[in-house]
Amino acid sequence: NKNFLARFRGWIQAAATLLTNIHIPNLFKGKIYQGNVKTMCVPGLNCYSCPAATGACPIGAFQAVVGSSKFKFTYYITGFFILLGVLLGRFICGFLCPFGWFQDLLHKIPGKKLSTAKLKPLRYLKYVILVVFVILLPAFVTNSLGMGDPFFCKYICPQGVLEGAIPLALANSGIRAALGHLFTFKFTILALFIILSILFYRPFCKWICPLGAIYSLFNKVSFLKIQVDHEKCVGCQKCSRVCKMDVNVVDTPNHPECIRCGECMKACPTDAICYHYGFSTKKQAENKN
């Protein structure tokens, strides 16, 4: 079935989260896995300090290199971003990111849901955060040894608290005793995004995530795309109405905000929307106008 990925998305997200955090026993031991695999980056936003983490967070790894006193252009991590971006684009956000799945689960909690359609300008904030907190501040705000802090991880990222600080503190009395104002500040950010995720769909992905900002740059050229068959399309706009990322699916199926979740495919009454594999866009006709 052409919509196989969309139909089994929840299971794929669960499997991806498990593979990204395969060392489950470490959660109870309060120890961080530091084996050879930890030098490799995982696709989604997943804290290095999570005791169960299989690999490194690409954003954290990038900041570590940028903030190093012996800074060199990080060919490995930059190449990692480009490779995954060119192959999948923001499919990673929709299917492979643990924090994205966490927000999806929160949004399933029954209650009033709010639209982000009128908040579209906030989507550009994640690009500002990418440039300022992931690149510029770690590179140029340094200590006496010439080393910069991982500003995004340290001061913004809620995933670090959820996966790293909280499990480690629960398992280690020494860490609990050392928690201070920074933890309180970060925990407040996490709590805020938990509340926002119940009300809005994926607020962190839309407005804050620098990893999503990077992958979004490749959405229009990636190997995996969304394809609209305009000969089948009847212009009902059901696809755009169900899109929780506020994308006009018919006009811009591969918009930078599209996370390839497939909800538009399930809503289409004529099966005019499907995944398209390949770099060629010949089959992906533009709209009739």
Name every feature range the model reports, one short phrase each.
Residues 1-250, 256-289:
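Non-ligating segments of multi-cofactor redox enzymes
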